[in-house]
């Protein structure tokens, strides 16, 4: 019997060792899974933070470019009154030689002024036949015998824009 008892104890010891090995393996697997999960969570957080940082960089660059493009907007808007005055001076009829020379000088000044405005992105809004509320300001409506409804009849004051932003709409009369 003692031989059987010995065999039984040996089997028990082997089973016990085998169970301990399995338990140890299970513990290692659980720890490895936990570490992998922690790693995946941290990697996901890193990727999200990095993507958010890149989006912030792009947004800041876009805002910087926009600020640069429109930095002179209010200054340019104020200069449009000077431009209007120069254009009005050009439209005055001259009858003597001195007035013609002055008008020529004003025209040269106006041309230079327009070139400088264009250099900084201020451009004339092109005249369009159809009324566009994004570009035009309707001052009044007229009966348009020769014009279709909604068509621009007369430009009363030129409009200007910087890049794609209107700084002064074109003031027009519109056919009913």
From Swiss-Prot:
Keyword Nucleus (UniProt) = no
The answer to keyword Transport applying to this record is no
List the molecular function annotations (GO) for this entry: adenyl-nucleotide exchange factor activity; protein homodimerization activity; protein-folding chaperone binding; unfolded protein binding
Q: Where in the cell is it found?
A: Cytoplasm
- UniProt-listed SUPFAM superfamilies: Coiled-coil domain of nucleotide exchange factor GrpE, Head domain of nucleotide exchange factor GrpE
Task: Give the record's keywords alphabetically.
Answer: Chaperone, Cytoplasm, Stress response
A single Pfam family it belongs to is GrpE
User: Entry's NCBIfam families?
Assistant: PRK14140.1, PRK14159.1
* Family listed: Belongs to the GrpE family.
Q: Which PANTHER family match?
A: GRPE PROTEIN (PTHR21237), GRPE PROTEIN HOMOLOG, MITOCHONDRIAL (PTHR21237:SF23)
Q: Which HAMAP family match?
A: GrpE
The UniProt subunit note reads as follows:
Homodimer.
Name of the protein: Protein GrpE
Which organism was this protein described from?
Campylobacter jejuni subsp. doylei (strain ATCC BAA-1458 / RM4099 / 269.97)
